[in-house]
Amino acid sequence: MTSVVVVGTQWGDEGKGKITDFLSSDAEVIARYQGGDNAGHTIVIDNKKFKLHLIPSGIFFPEKISVIGNGVVVNPKSLVKELAYLHEEGVTTDNLRISDRAHVILPYHIKLDQLQEEAKGDNKIGTTIKGIGPAYMDKAARVGIRIADLLDRDIFAERLKTNLAEKNRLFEKMYDSAPIAFDEIFEEYYAYGQEIKKYVTDTSVILNDALDAGKRVLFEGAQGVMLDIDQGTYPFVTSSNPVAGGVTIGSGVGPSKINKVVGVCKAYTSRVGDGPFPTELFDEVGERIREIGHEYGTTTGRPRRVGWFDSVVMRHSRRVSGITNLSLNSIDVLSGLETVKICVAYDLDGKRIDHYPASLEQLKRCKPIYEELPGWSEDITGVRSLEDLPENARNYVRRIGELVGVRISTFSVGPGREQTNILESVWATI
């Protein structure tokens, strides 16, 4: 039994897709356990970029099984579009498996997401308007439609009618918005269901059988710990649990079967959307990092907010996800800076604190306490070992490991597979 979980340790966009793709070469099954098509990940293969939102990164390995677990909310329209995109690029999807227990995102979820966000005005969350939150709301309220329901014409029709009646009352009475007709959804989405039917199965059986047989299983998280609905910067969070604990709920695999948790982070910090961000940069350094790092959302295209590396955030992520190994990305983006900074603690009303506050009001008053290190000017994109890094870059990497309290297993100096350097194989140490 061998399993590794890959989680984002910041606010998403840490490079999880790249690291999952890298670790997938030694895995036999790759599974996604939460989120929806609000999460974008970019994989670079032979200098060609592939952008995915729903399908696991392991799809590029035809001999390996790729799983969309029960904790994922699936927009069938987006999924069919993504499948077509992969087919056009010559990528086979015969190795894809989709949980029959996964919940379905429908047009009324997307409409409700938009109306709710507009109604919040200045207090908006900054969602991707993909219907993720409303779909998880229906799931918790026990009125959601699952993939298994979508495949049964009569059951889908019955449940869609019931849900539309409720949602349309909400649209008309609360939001003064036009209702959605049954015929606008039913045939189109039933057809999507039939198109993906061949991939649908009980994925918990596949995953547990693989683990019991001693196969290597890689679990791929979406978003990041700081967007977790319980452990993140609530309410500026997603509606699911990206933390490693989400694996057990979102994949149907027990906690005793999880061996390693790899936390993925960048050598700086970024986030999309609203919410607290103590180390955010508003100067030319921030603009430089954004441009060199191509910090624009895969899903939204929005410019990402950027800031210095925050070890307070990282220690919080380490604790709540049980991170055993760290994967540090985008070190190359900081090349050329005379000085690099790491936030080591916060100043809250004159008192030093080392933990991340739950209160948004306290977070607003937190000022980062920085440790400054000398930067480096060398081009490091061709570096293939820690020893080959310039001394200042090497010291920066080591200091991050010390402050977070987790050993660094891999570090990356660019987006390509070949630019990921192994310090310690997470598979070999299990």
Curated annotation (Swiss-Prot):
Active-site feature positions: D13, H41
Entry GO terms, CC: cytoplasm
GO molecular function, one term: magnesium ion binding
EC code(s) of this entry: 6.3.4.4
Cofactor: Mg(2+)
UniProt: Mg(2+) binding residues: D13, G40
Binding residue positions for IMP: D13, E14, G15, K16, N38, A39, G40, H41, T128, R142, Q223, T238, R302
Reaction equations catalysed: IMP + L-aspartate + GTP = N(6)-(1,2-dicarboxyethyl)-AMP + GDP + phosphate + 2 H(+)
HAMAP family: Adenylosucc_synth
Name recorded for this polypeptide: Adenylosuccinate synthetase
Gene behind the chain: purA
